[in-house]
C-alpha cells in the first residue's frame, strides 16, 4: 500500500546511490566519441550535481581510454571513481592503474552468467564461470577495498545460479553486487521479485545495484522496481544515452523519486537544479540531441499547447504541472541582457546562470561573441547565454573563422568564400559544393589541408523566435578516429562552418577517439 504524504513526512528517507555511467556505457552509443577534455568536463558536472559514483571508462579498451580515466581520477573529487574490467588480469590491472589516483576508487568487474552467454560466448561451464568471477574479485581487492561485481545478462540467468555466483563474489570481497538487464528484456514485476529474492540470499551489508537497458522502453520503470525490491544503487546515464536503445535515464529516475517520495520514500542527494545543464552539456558533447518530448529535460516537458491546459496553468501551475521547471534548472524566457550591456553585467548574468567558474580569459572571448549576437538580435535571453556558453571551445584554436560569403541560388552551383585565421595569418579559399554548407566545408578543408568524412549532420534551434540561435552537430571520421563537432550561430552556414572548424582543430590537437573494443558490456 502506498504511503500517504503525511506518513512520508515522518518516515526516514532511504538513500539510493546514483551510479552514473554516461562516460562508459553512454559513450558506447553509436556515433559518440568523447575526448579527454570533454569527459573531464562531464565528470566535473556530475560531481557538482552530487552523483555517488562515476564510471569513468573502460581502461583496457585503448591507451586513450586509460589516460581519460586516470585524468578524471586525478582531478575529480567527491564521487567514487570506478573503471570497468572484464574478469581477467589484464583488464583488472588496467582498471586499477586508471583509478589509482582517485580520492575514492572502485574496480567494477563482470562476467556473463546467462546460459546463452556462457555457452555461445564464453564456452565455459557454470562452475568455471564462478571460478573466474572469484579470481577477478580477489585480484581487484588487491588494489582497492571497494569492488563491484556484475553478472552480465543477469535477467536471463537462472536465479539459483545468480545466487551462487553472487555469494561467491561477496565471499571473495565484492562490496556491491550489480544485476544488469543487459538486453532490456525484463519487466518491472520480474525485476522487483528478482531483487527481493537476491536480497534474501545475500548478506545485509552488500549493496544491490541495478543496471537497466531500454530495449523495451522499461529501463526507468525496471530501475524503480529494483529499488522497491531492495536495490540501493541505480546505474544510469544522462539523457538515457547508451548502447542500442540506451540506458535508464538519470534525470527521470531522480525526479520520479523526488516527485513521488510520498510513494517511494527514497532520496538520492542529487542537486536537481543541475539536471538541465548536465543534459544540455552531454547532448552537445555527444552530438545526440534530446527529443523534444523527453521527460524532465525535453523542450516540451513544461510546454502547454492546449487552451484548456494553458488557462489552468495560468490560474494555478499545479493544475497541469507536477513539478516546477526551475527545480530541474529550467528558467523562464527572462530578458537578461541587451546590446548596451557591459562586461560586468555579462559576468553577473553568467554567474546567475550557474557559470561563475568560467575563467576570465574565457569570459572575455564569450563577451565578444555576446556583443556580436546582441548586434544581430538586440535582446538576449537566458537561453541565448546558455547556448553561447555551451558552444565555447575547449579545443586549441589553430584555425578560427574570420569571415565567409556564400553565393547560391536555384539552378546554380553554390560557391563559398571563406577566410580563416591560421598560424600563418589570414588565409582565403573558394570552393563549390552540392549546397552552401558543403561548399563552406570544402573551402575550409582547402585551407586546413584536412578532409575528414562527414558521417552525420544535425541542426536544431536552441533558442526561440525568428532570430533564434541554431546549433549544428556533426560526426566525422578521420582515418580510424571519430570526432564530434558543434557550432552555434543565428546563421546556419556559419554554425556549420564553426562545427567543421572545431573538428579541424580537434584533429590537429590529436583529440579524436578511436573505439578499440566493441565487445558488449553490462
From Swiss-Prot:
Localization per record: Cytoplasm
Positions of Mn(2+) binding: 25, 211, 213, 247
Source organism, top-level taxon: Bacteria
GO molecular function: 2-isopropylmalate synthase activity; acetyl-CoA C-acetyltransferase activity; manganese ion binding
Pathway(s) this gene product operates in, as recorded in its UniProt entry: Amino-acid biosynthesis; L-leucine biosynthesis; L-leucine from 3-methyl-2-oxobutanoate: step 1/4
Region feature (Regulatory domain): 400-522
Any matching Pfam family: LeuA_dimer
Required cofactor(s): Mn(2+)
InterPro entries xref list: 2-IPM_HCS-like, 2-isopropylmalate_synth_dimer, AIPM/Hcit_synth_CS, Aldolase_TIM, LeuA/HCS_post-cat, LeuA_allosteric_dom_sf, LeuA_bact_synth, PYR_CT
EC number(s) on file: 2.3.3.13
An annotated GO BP: L-leucine biosynthetic process
Main subcellular localisation: cytoplasm
Uppermost EC category: transferase
Protein role: Catalyzes the condensation of the acetyl group of acetyl-CoA with 3-methyl-2-oxobutanoate (2-ketoisovalerate) to form 3-carboxy-3-hydroxy-4-methylpentanoate (2-isopropylmalate).
Quaternary structure note: Homodimer.
UniProt-recorded name of the protein: 2-isopropylmalate synthase
Originating organism: Deinococcus radiodurans (strain ATCC 13939 / DSM 20539 / JCM 16871 / CCUG 27074 / LMG 4051 / NBRC 15346 / NCIMB 9279 / VKM B-1422 / R1)
Amino acid at each position: 500500500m502506498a504511503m500517504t504524504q503525511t506518513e512520508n513526512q515522518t518516515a526516514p528517507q532511504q538513500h539510493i546511490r546514483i551510479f552514473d555511467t554516461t562516460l562508459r556505457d553512454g559513450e558506447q552509443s553509436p556515433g559518440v566519441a568523447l575526448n579527454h577534455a570533454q569527459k573531464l568536463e562531464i565528470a566535473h558536472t556530475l560531481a557538482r550535481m552530487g552523483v555517488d559514483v562515476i564510471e569513468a571508462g573502460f581502461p583496457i579498451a585503448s591507451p586513450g581510454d586509460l589516460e581519460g580515466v586516470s585524468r578524471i581520477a586525478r582531478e575529480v573529487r567527491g564521487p567514487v571513481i570506478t573503471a570497468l574490467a572484464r574478469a581477467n588480469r589484464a583488464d583488472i590491472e588496467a582498471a586499477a592503474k586508471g583509478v589509482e589516483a582517485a580520492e575514492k576508487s572502485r574496480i567494477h568487474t563482470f562476467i556473463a552468467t546467462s546460459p546463452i552467454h556462457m555457452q555461445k560466448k564464453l564456452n565455459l561451464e557454470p562452475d568455471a564461470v564462478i571460478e573466474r568471477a572469484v579470481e577477478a574479485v580477489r585480484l581487484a581487492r588487491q588494489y582497492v577495498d571497494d569492488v563491484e561485481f556484475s553478472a552480465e545478462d543477469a535477467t536471463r540467468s537462472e536465479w539459483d545460479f545468480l545466487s551462487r555466483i553472487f555469494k561467491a563474489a561477496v565471499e571473495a570481497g565484492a562490496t556491491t553486487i550489480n544485476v544488469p538487464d543487459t538486453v532490456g528484456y525484463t519487466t518491472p514485476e520480474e525485476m522487483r521479485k528478482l531483487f527481493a529474492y537476491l536480497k534474501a540470499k545475500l548478506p545485509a551489508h552488500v549493496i544491490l545495484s541495478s543496471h537497466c537497458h531500454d530495449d523495451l522502453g522499461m529501463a526507468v520503470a525496471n530501475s524503480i522496481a529494483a529499488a522497491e525490491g531492495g536495490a540501493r544503487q541505480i546505474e544510469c546515464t544522462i539523457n538515457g544515452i547508451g548502447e542500442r536503445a540506451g540506458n535508464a535515464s538519470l534525470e527521470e529516475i531522480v525526479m520520479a523519486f523526488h516527485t513521488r517520495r510520498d510513494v517511494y520514500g527514497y532520496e538520492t542527494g542529487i542537486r536537481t537544479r543541475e539536471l538541465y545543464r548536465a543534459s544540455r552539456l552531454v547532448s552537445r558533447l555527444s552530438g545526440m540531441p534530446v527529443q523534444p518530448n523527453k521527460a524532465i529535460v525535453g523542450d516540451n516537458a513544461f510546454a502547454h499547447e492546449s487552451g484548456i491546459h494553458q488557462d489552468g496553468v495560468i490560474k494555478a501551475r499545479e493544475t497541469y504541472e507536477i513539478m516546477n521547471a526551475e527545480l530541474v534548472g529550467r528558467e523562464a524566457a527572462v530578458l537578461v541582457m541587451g546590446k548596451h550591456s557591459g562586461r560586468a553585467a555579462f559576468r553577473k548574468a553568467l554567474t546567475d546562470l550557474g557559470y561563475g567558474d568560467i575563467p576570465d580569459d574565457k569570459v572575455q572571448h564569450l563577451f565578444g561573441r555576446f556583443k556580436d549576437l546582441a548586434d544581430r538580435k538586440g535582446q538576449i535571453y537566458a537561453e541565448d547565454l546558455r547556448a553561447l556558453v555551451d558552444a565555447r571551445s575547449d579545443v586549441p584554436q589553430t584555425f578560427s573563422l574570420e569571415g565567409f560569403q556564400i553565393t547560391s541560388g536555384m539552378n546554380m552551383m553554390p560557391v563559398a568564400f571563406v577566410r580563416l585565421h591560421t598560424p600563418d595569418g589570414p588565409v582565403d579559399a573558394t570552393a563549390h559544393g552540392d549546397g552552401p554548407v558543403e561548399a563552406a566545408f570544402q573551402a575550409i578543408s582547402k585551407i586546413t589541408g584536412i578532409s575528414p568524412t562527414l558521417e552525420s549532420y544535425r541542426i536544431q534551434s536552441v533558442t526561440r523566435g525568428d532570430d533564434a540561435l541554431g546549433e549544428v552537430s556533426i560526426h566525422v571520421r578521420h582515418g580510424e578516429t571519430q570526432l564530434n563537432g558543434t557550432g552555434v550561430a543565428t546563421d546556419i552556414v556559419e554554425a556549420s562552418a564553426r562545427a567543421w572548424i572545431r573538428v579541424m582543430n580537434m584533429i590537429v590537437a590529436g583529440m579524436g577517439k578511436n573505439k578499440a573494443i566493441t565487445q558488449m558490456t553490462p
